[in-house]
Design a protein with these regions (language model features):
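Short beta-strand
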Residues: 80-84
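Right-hand nucleic-acid polymerase module
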Residues: 2-50, 55-74, 78, 96-206
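Short beta-strand-to-loop capping motifs
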Residues: 91-95
């Protein structure tokens, strides 16, 4: 996704988004934007792993997002909801729908916007509330709740257990290990606060 995003496409999309449209039209500010964008691109495309890449693509895809969102609100008799973060597109609905029709529509919108993107059908999944649906690293389960899944819960529990065991044996953890554990706990707490609180309470007494 990032490796397909060129500066030319970025400028074309920014030209229809305020206030970038005014910056591009103004001969005194256009060079500043050009220089700023040059710092964002590597070998003509956005590099993977930099903070600016998802931020920039989220901005330039606003016109595309609006067009797709509005079209899917009434698509083949279905009210579908479109969401996207970077290259992760999610289309959801209350009832079953033909996902291949939606995929073809998304492809047609890429062509309409002359976007340098194509759907990756190997990573395209269709699921229902009865199954396990993973979206951006979290799972929407059959109980219609967001969860991080058993494997991650087991890993966090094992990390906390290891920390408690080392603490009780006077074997101090290093700064990096502590920050990693603290980050994982904070992440869990933001998604499953009740589970996180119960887990911490359990090990607090150990």
């Amino acid at each position: 996704f990032f490796g397909s995003t060129t500066k030319a496409f970025t400028l074309r999309m920014l030209s229809v988004i305020w206030p970038f449209s005014e910056i591009i039209e103004d001969s005194s500010t256009r060079p500043i934007l050009d220089r700023a964008l040059d710092l964002c691109f590597l070998d003509g495309v956005l590099p993977q792993g930099t903070p600016i890449s998802p931020m920039l693509t989220n901005i330039i895809m606003i016109p595309f997002d609006h067009a797709v969102f509005n079209s899917l609100r009434n698509f083949g008799g279905h009210h579908l909801v479109y969401t996207r973060y970077a290259d992760d597109l999610t289309i959801s609905g209350r009832y079953d729908f033909k996902w291949t029709d939606v995929a073809q529509f998304i492809e047609s919108m890429f062509r309409k916007f002359d976007a340098p993107y194509r759907l990756n059908y190997e990573k395209t999944h269709y699921g229902s509330c009865a199954g396990r649906n993973w979206i951006l690293g979290v799972m929407y389960n059959k109980d219609r709740k967001i969860t991080l899944g058993k494997k991650r819960k087991d890993a966090l529990r094992a990390s906390i257990c290891d920390y408690v065991r080392c603490r009780n044996a006077d074997r101090a953890w290093g700064y990096t290990e502590l920050k990693s554990l603290d980050g994982n706990i904070s992440y869990f707490n933001s998604i499953e606060p009740e589970y996180t609180a119960a887990l911490l309470e359990h090990y607090h007494t150990k």
